[in-house]
Swiss-Prot record:
Chaperone involved in the correct folding and assembly of outer membrane proteins. Recognizes specific patterns of aromatic residues and the orientation of their side chains, which are found more frequently in integral outer membrane proteins. May act in both early periplasmic and late outer membrane-associated steps of protein maturation. The keyword Chaperone applies. The gene is surA. It comes from the Bacteria. It catalyses: [protein]-peptidylproline (omega=180) = [protein]-peptidylproline (omega=0). One of its GO terms (biological process) is protein stabilization. Residues 1-13 form the signal peptide. Its EC number is 5.2.1.8. Coiled coil: none annotated. This is Chaperone SurA. PROSITE patterns: PPIC_PPIASE_2. The PPIase activity resides only in the second parvulin domain. The N-terminal region and the C-terminal tail are necessary and sufficient for the chaperone activity of SurA. The PPIase activity is dispensable for SurA to function as a chaperone. The N-terminal region and the C-terminal tail are also required for porin recognition. Keywords: Chaperone, Isomerase, Periplasm, Repeat, Rotamase, Signal.
């Protein structure tokens, strides 16, 4: 959504009247004006892609479900003390402007020219960043890929053939809950087959995705962006290399339901780097939580930094305080790392810290860090780069599946009461 901020007309200058509640979501509500505004945004996005624009009534259930999931994640972020500072927000806005080949001032002017509010745009970006950090903590951090999985993947025909090719895809997901009965699964299969038949006869993929798909990207016409084939569920791996652009795959059952893919574009892989800079670094991570505020977390990181500066042992303090389970027991040692594999905030601080010196406390999506650079080197990374690429596609594949499962879980566990006239009640 962020990358399409300008194109989609996603932020409106005029504040719409809050006329009625359409959903109660745990401790918050969603107003009809919010839903109506999002429906208009989706219609504008679909229209700019040249697809047929669905009626507002057809989009309302999908839009409301998206707003409910966003609301639940924002509430989680609030309870967990996740905040986005103005400096972080300014940096994100700068990145969005750069992606649109603009300066920030040009970006603001372009928004104003289109009758859009820069202040509303900032708040939309802030919400997206909070949701991203919630997902990082709740989903991405618990995904594990073993060395054996990487080796097996690289040795497989799928791994050898697919690491070098990328596909721009759109998808339609007909979801099946974990507890779905055999009749419900059969009904989903029939629905997916019916949609596939419509698509083969020339039906508008983006329009059908926006009105029927349960996928996270349904309201973007199902657009998934660029993916390695290996990142996708196994049934699709062998189909995509030989599939003509514009074609769709038959429905395939996955853990989340029945998926149909459309191939939008195809491109060859990037060349592998032969040499790579690596940094030997150790760090201490302190995370905010429901019982420790952002400010208290920052203060604790500052105190640890001062203790190290005053001569206390870094490794000992890391074992006592660090909340990074992968490095705490090793005294915070991350060993030799590729800077490009790290989140930008960590990478930038590490790059600017001289060898043998300590950084001041700094913040990333994971929490507050103190790091020490122990060494730098250039290494032949041909094999390591391929291992890292395999690790990345396996993690992304698991993340996509885990995210859908987690979103269903938080939706099922929440109290949600739908008050939209004519909608099915979904209170829990």
């Amino acid at each position: 959504m962020l990358g399409a901020l300008l194109l989609s007309g996603a932020v409106h200058a005029a504040v719409q009247p809050l006329d009625s509640v359409v959903a109660i979501v745990d401790n918050d509500v969603i107003m009809k004006s919010q839903m109506d505004q999002r429906v208009r945004e989706v219609q504008q996005t679909i229209a700019k892609r040249g697809s047929g624009v669905p009626p507002a009534a057809d989009l309302q259930p999908q839009v409301l479900d998206r707003l409910i999931l966003e609301n639940l994640q924002l509430q989680m972020g609030e309870r967990s003390g996740i905040r986005v500072s103005d400096d972080e927000l300014n940096q994100a806005i700068g990145t969005i402007a750069q992606r649109n080949n603009m300066s920030v001032e040009q970006f603001r002017a372009a928004l104003a020219h289109d009758g859009l509010s820069y202040e509303d745009a900032r708040e939309q970006v802030r919400r997206e960043m909070i949701i991203s950090r919630v997902r990082q903590r709740r989903v991405a951090e618990r995904i594990q890929v073993s060395e054996q999985e990487v080796k097996n993947f690289l040795a497989s025909d799928q791994g050898k053939a697919q690491l070098s090719e990328e596909f721009h895809l759109a998808n339609i997901l007909i979801a099946t809950p974990d507890s779905a009965s055999s009749d419900a699964i059969q009904a989903a299969a029939v629905k997916a087959k019916s949609i596939y038949d419509q698509l083969k006869k020339g039906a508008d993929f983006a329009k059908i995705a926006a009105t029927t798909s349960s996928s996270e990207n349904a309201l973007e016409g199902g657009d998934m962006g660029w993916r390695k084939a290996a990142q996708l569920p196994p049934p699709f791996g062998d189909m995509l290399s030989s599939m003509p652009i514009g074609d769709v795959t038959p429905p395939a059952r996955t853990p989340g339901g029945f998926i149909i893919l459309k191939l939008l574009e195809k491109r060859g892989g990037q060349g592998q780097a032969q040499m790579r800079d690596e940094v030997h670094v150790r760090h201490i991570l302190i995370k905010p939580s429901e019982i420790r505020s952002e400010e208290a977390t920052k203060l604790l990181a500052q105190k640890i930094y001062e203790r190290i500066e005053n001569g206390e042992d870094f490794a000992t303090l890391a074992k006592s305080f660090s909340e990074d389970p992968g490095s705490a027991l090793n005294g915070g040692d991350l060993n030799w790392v590729d800077p490009n594999s790290l989140v930008p905030e960590f990478r930038d601080v590490m790059s600017s810290t001289p060898q043998g010196e300590l950084s001041k406390p700094f913040k990333t999506a994971y929490g507050w860090h103190v790091l020490e650079v122990l060494g730098r080197r250039a290494t032949d990374a041909t094999g390591q780069a391929r291992d890292q690429q395999a690790l990345s596609v396996l993690r992304n594949r698991k993340y996509d599946e885990e995210l859908q499962t987690w979103l269903r879980q938080i939706r099922d566990e929440a109290y949600v009461e739908i008050k939209l006239p004519g909608a099915t009640q979904a209170a829990q």
